[in-house]
A protein has these predicted regions:
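Hydrophobic anchor at the start of a short beta-strand
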Residues: 83-84, 109, 148
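Asp-based, Mg2+/Mn2+-dependent phosphohydrolase catalytic module
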Residues: 119, 135-190
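Short, acidic loop-to-helix structural element flanking the phosphoryl-transfer center
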Residues: 58-86, 91-97
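Active-site neighborhood of HAD-like aspartate-dependent phosphohydrolases
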Residues: 1-50
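Short glycine/proline- and acidic residue-enriched helix-loop micro-motifs
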Residues: 51-59
Length: 190
């Protein structure tokens, strides 16, 4: 199967980093449990951009700690022959640091894409399953005929309750939900 996997808030917990940057730079608290939709309304666009830039610098990227079971799950899927496309809204300039981080933590990948239009790239690559936290990306992928899954967060919980999205609280649960699908759809990487 051809699998696309997001990074921030999917392979590792990103919200704490973003929230820390907002508090340090602007004195604005961004409580995780209160982030009930995809828009971050407590920050102006320029403030959000600065916080994202800070959290996507090389030092911050290389310090990222993956979620428990994320690395082992993705590595197992890759070893089973699944194509792994890692995708992120990170700026293209973050590609090198992101590739080093993935190698450093042990996540194998066949393709890495850092740009904003993830779903178009997924369609271009023939991706069959997208794992992402963004409700916008999940819905666009469903519209494109791509299966979707997510780690549950406050901003995507409602989508999990209403749409055909495979959801789990953590990577262990996500792997349990996806493994039978992946066994049925196994295909050697092209």
């Amino acid at each position: 199967m051809r699998i696309a996997i997001d990074i921030d808030s999917t392979l590792h917990h990103y919200w704490d980093r973003l929230s820390d940057a907002a508090l340090r730079r602007f004195g604005i608290d961004l409580p995780y449990e209160e982030q009930l939709d995809w828009g971050i309304t407590r920050l102006r666009h320029d403030q959000l951009h600065l916080c994202i830039k800070e959290t996507h610098c090389e030092k911050a990227i290389l310090a990222g700690e993956p979620y428990p079971d994320a690395v082992d799950t993705v590595a197992r899927w890759h070893a089973e022959g699944h194509f792994i496309h890692v995708t992120s809204h990170r700026d293209p300039d973050a590609w090198d640091a992101t590739a080093r981080w993935l190698t450093q933590i042990g996540v194998p990948f066949d393709d890495l894409y850092c740009a904003h239009d993830k779903v178009s790239r997924c369609v271009e690559l023939g991706i069959e399953l997208l794992i992402d936290d963004s409700p916008e990306n999940l819905l666009r992928a469903v519209d494109a005929g791509i299966l979707v899954a997510t780690i549950v967060h406050p901003w995507n919980r409602e989508l999990c309750e209403e749409e055909d999205v495979m959801c789990a609280d953590d990577w262990r649960g996500l792997a349990a939900k996806l493994d039978s699908l992946l066994r049925r759809r196994a295909r050697v990487r092209p």
